[in-house]
Swiss-Prot record:
Lineage: Bacteria, Pseudomonadati, Pseudomonadota, Gammaproteobacteria, Enterobacterales
PROSITE patterns reported in the protein's UniProt record: NA_DICARBOXYL_SYMP_1, NA_DICARBOXYL_SYMP_2
InterPro entries per record: C4_dicarb_transport, Na-dicarboxylate_symporter, Na-dicarboxylate_symporter_CS, Na:dicarbo_symporter_sf
Protein name stated in the entry: Aerobic C4-dicarboxylate transport protein
Effect of inactivating the gene: Cells lacking this gene are only able to grow after a 2-day lag period on D-malate as sole carbon source.
Source organism (scientific name): Escherichia coli (strain K12)
Matching Pfam families: SDF
Length: 428
């Protein structure tokens, strides 16, 4: 029993995070030097994200009997994303208004160091709607894979899958090659995941070493408020959706606990994307649904980021005594409904979108970003964890809506009654 515990990725990552926190706290200079370990692990993951998405989507779409099913899945997924993301934005807006973590700070925006956030503000200038849509279209196929842009790779994979499906039996050889290549890629993922404890240790040691526990205490009210909001969202909102779909949110969280710990250590939900594709398929969701919903969700279904954006924007308004009446808050909500769709599931993207939002709204000081720059790294953990759970739940819900969910397999796996790989008849 003890041997199996020590060998489990869950235990190893949890232990690595704890050691990283201790090292960063007691030896901050050494902790900061551990940054390459975390960065290296995330880069290894990003290295295989593009081929994983390509193989999963192509084989999923090409293997479907009807192309109408693909269109239906995409439409249902986008509808779900929009509804749940809007709920997340509204919840964040309500709670930050009730708790008011920034009230009484009386910060003069003129005294803030605008240089500290200049790089984010500059990046935010390119976050327009048209720019976002145009960025989905790659300049070249090779460029899409080289940059690792999820939506660009997804677009090419969908087109490739459609074209391969139309070839029929003539494309069977290509289909078999891609499916075999997919197995090789997942073999690489298994090797990379053995390094997850090292990556989590390095990332956590760097975070605590660089920013210190003092940063947490200084703006602790906002951090606590945000974490509690994310927990409530997962338990109440996603929990209710899960219950209505026929499964327990707590059993699902237990099922993806290793992925959650990896995300906790790296602060990026993208680091668990390859394993989530595999795990959601083993949970009973058809491959074509998983291949479409998970990658798309990384740009359109970021529940944790949505909560963060409304809370952070209103917090800055409260701290700087900027006017924020009901009209301004509705305007903020409308802007965020659009700008939040450009936030990929990578560390720092939420901060860039926040800068873009403050610029678009107009009456909020962009320099106010300096207030939360130091604690953004600590808040990114809750963002990433909520995003991951949200995308997992979305996949199951969409799979059920389009009748591509194996209910018995879902129930068996979550209740530990069957091996992950066992198959059952699809139920509608």
């Amino acid at each position: 029993m003890k041997t199996s515990l020590f060998k489990s990725l869950y235990f190893q990552v949890l232990t690595a995070i704890a050691i990283g926190i201790l090292l960063g706290h007691f030896y901050p200079e050494i902790g900061e030097q551990m940054k390459p370990l975390g960065d290296g692990f995330v880069k290894l993951i990003k290295m295989i994200i593009a081929p994983v998405i390509f193989c999963t989507v192509v084989t999923g779409i090409a293997g479907m009997e009807s192309m109408k099913a693909v269109g239906r899945t995409g439409a249902v997924a986008l509808l779900y994303f929009e509804i749940v993301s809007t709920i997340a934005l509204i919840i964040g807006l309500i709670i930050v208004n009730v708790v008011q973590p920034g009230a009484g700070m009386n910060v003069d925006p003129a005294t803030l160091d605008a240089k500290a956030v200049a790089v984010y503000a500059d990046q935010a200038k390119d976050q327009g709607i048209v720019a976002f849509i145009m960025d989905v279209i790659p300049a070249s196929v090779i460029g899409a894979f080289a940059s690792g842009n999820i939506l660009q790779v997804l677009l090419f994979a969908v087109l490739f899958g459609f074209a391969l499906h139309r070839l029929g039996s003539k494309g069977q050889l290509i289909f078999n090659v891609i499916e075999s290549f997919s197995q090789v890629i997942f073999g690489i993922i298994n090797m990379i995941m053995r390094l997850a404890p090292i990556g989590a240790f390095g990332a956590m040691a760097f975070t605590i070493g660089k920013y210190g526990v003092g940063t947490l205490v200084q703006l602790g009210q906002l951090i606590i408020c945000f974490y509690i909001t994310c927990i409530l969202f997962v338990v109440l909102v996603l929990g209710s959706i899960a219950k209505a779909t026929g499964f327990s949110i707590f059993k699902f969280i237990r099922y993806i606990r290793e992925e959650l710990l990896i995300v906790l250590g790296t602060s990026s939900s993208e680091s668990a994307l390859p394993r989530m594709l595999d795990k959601m398929e083993k949970l009973g969701c058809r491959k074509s649904v998983v291949g479409l919903v998970i990658p798309t969700g990384y740009s359109f279904n970021l529940d944790g980021t949505s909560i963060y954006l409304t809370m952070a924007a209103v917090f800055i308004a409260q701290a700087t005594n900027s006017q924020m009446d009901i009209v301004h808050q509705i305007t903020l909500l409308i802007v965020l409904l659009l700008s939040s769709k450009g936030a990929a599931g990578v560390t720092g993207s939420g901060f860039i979108v926040l800068a873009a939002t403050l610029s678009a709204v107009g009456h909020l000081p962009v320099a106010g970003l300096a207030l939360i720059l130091g604690i953004d790294r600590f808040m990114s953990e809750a963002r990433a964890l909520t995003n991951l759970v949200g995308n997992g739940v979305a996949t199951i819900v969409v799979a059920k809506w389009v009748k591509e969910l194996d209910h018995k397999k879902l129930d068996d796996v979550l209740n530990n009654r069957a091996p992950d790989g066992k198959t059952h008849e699809l139920s509608s």
